[in-house]
């Protein structure tokens, strides 16, 4: 499936129906009064978050979404039919902005969460509304009001508890395929992963945790270099970052610092997110020339985060690393619950 994480669309709510001018014409009411009904309300445009969508691909092919107009008023004080609301389904994790002002309109993170994004126009008034002691036969009515019209920018931020980050070719796709049933494209060259891959990793309890393999970041990603700028936003919703570092690199410390600097430059508290570090590809390291334990100690001193020696290919060290992930997630969940009840 092609991954589309941004889209620009136009939405327009329905116009309110027009009020009408009408008079009672019953046989035994020779001086019938006004009976023109009001117009119906225009339909609204409502966004609904659903679980079975993972991309904004549908919005690439359809850019304009319009709800139905309200019906005209009728005689005998009948109000026109309301226009049908237009329901637009979006993936959970969709953030909606006004494309012209940049204002945040909504953030749909939960299944079935709804947001009225454009309200339908109010129906116009029929002439019966204008009946008064001074005017017993008003011959005018009001048209319905237009519905709201907006130009929107949609952004999809993945809903994953654990974000796997690192430079290109750190082994992120291999790791997520080893941990879960996900089968991302894997090859030995940079930027193999062009879209974020999701995998569900099972805890010993059987509960699933969503991991996201974030495409490789490079120096300058926060300023738009490489693939990073478009994908850094996906890290925003994660609770824990699993920072993967290639143990076969010529300079492991430099690689670590490169990613940390990009997280700090991007802001939004990403550099303060709880992290676990993993030196990957230890099966390919010459232990006689590389002291992995010393590198792990250096990284621990730099990051103040736990460091694990792993191989995603041979699955060496994955279980202890996962136990640390589960423990940190439990801490984060406990802190969030404490904040809710405090």
From Swiss-Prot:
EC numbers for this chain: 3.6.5.-
Keywords: Cytoplasm, GTP-binding, Hydrolase, Magnesium, Metal-binding, Nucleotide-binding
Record-level GO cellular component terms: cytoplasm
Keyword Ribonucleoprotein: no
Domain Obg: from-to ranges: 1-159
Cofactor: Mg(2+)
Pfam families xrefs: GTP1_OBG, MMR_HSR1
Molecular function GO labels: GTP binding; GTPase activity; magnesium ion binding
Annotated Mg(2+) binding sites: 173, 193
OBG-type G domain location: 160-330
InterPro entries tied to this protein: G_OBG (IPR031167), GTP-bd (IPR006073), GTP-bd_Obg/CgtA (IPR014100), GTP1-OBG_CS (IPR006074), GTP1_OBG_dom (IPR006169), GTP1_OBG_dom_sf (IPR036726), OBG_GTPase (IPR045086), P-loop_NTPase (IPR027417)
Compartments, as annotated in UniProt: Cytoplasm
Family affiliation: Belongs to the TRAFAC class OBG-HflX-like GTPase superfamily. OBG GTPase family.
Assembly and binders: Monomer.
The protein's name in its UniProt record: GTPase Obg
UniProt organism field: Nostoc sp. (strain PCC 7120 / SAG 25.82 / UTEX 2576)
Taxonomic lineage of the native organism: Bacteria, Bacillati, Cyanobacteriota, Cyanophyceae, Nostocales
Gene coding for it: obg
């Amino acid at each position: 499936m092609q991954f589309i994480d941004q889209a620009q669309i136009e939405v327009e709510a329905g116009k309110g129906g027009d009020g009408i001018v009408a008079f009672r014409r019953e046989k035994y009411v020779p001086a019938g009064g006004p009976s023109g009904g009001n117009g119906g309300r225009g339909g609204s445009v409502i966004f609904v978050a659903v679980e079975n969508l993972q991309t904004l691909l549908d919005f690439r092919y359809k850019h304009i979404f319009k709800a139905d107009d309200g019906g005209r008023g009728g005689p005998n004080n009948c109000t026109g039919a309301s226009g049908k609301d237009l329901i637009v389904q979006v993936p959970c994790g969709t953030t909606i902005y006004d494309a012209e002002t940049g204002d945040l309109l909504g953030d749909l993170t939960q299944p079935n969460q709804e947001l009225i994004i454009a309200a339908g126009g109010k129906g116009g008034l029929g002439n019966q509304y204008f009946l008064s002691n001074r005017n017993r036969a008003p011959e005018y009515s009001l048209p319905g009001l237009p519905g709201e019209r907006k130009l929107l920018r949609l952004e999809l931020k993945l809903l994953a508890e654990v974000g796997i980050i690192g430079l290109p070719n750190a082994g992120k796709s291999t790791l997520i395929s080893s941990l879960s049933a996900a089968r991302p494209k894997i090859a030995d060259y940079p930027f193999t992963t062009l879209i974020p891959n999701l995998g569900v990793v099972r805890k010993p309890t059987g509960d699933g945790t969503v991991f996201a393999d974030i495409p490789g970041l490079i120096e300058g990603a926060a300023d738009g270099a490489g693939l990073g700028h478009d994908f850094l936003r996906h890290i925003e919703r994660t609770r824990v970052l699993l920072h993967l570092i290639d143990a076969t690199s010529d300079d492991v410390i430099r690689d670590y610092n490169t990613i940390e600097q990009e997280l700090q430059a991007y802001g939004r508290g990403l550099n303060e997110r709880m992290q676990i570090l993993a030196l990957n590809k230890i099966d390919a390291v010459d232990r006689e020339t590389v002291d992995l334990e010393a590198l792990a100690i250096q990284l621990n001193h730099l990051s103040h985060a736990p460091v694990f020696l792993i191989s995603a290919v041979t699955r060496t060290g994955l279980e202890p690393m996962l136990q640390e992930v589960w423990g940190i997630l439990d801490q984060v969940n406990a802190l969030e619950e404490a904040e809710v009840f405090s």
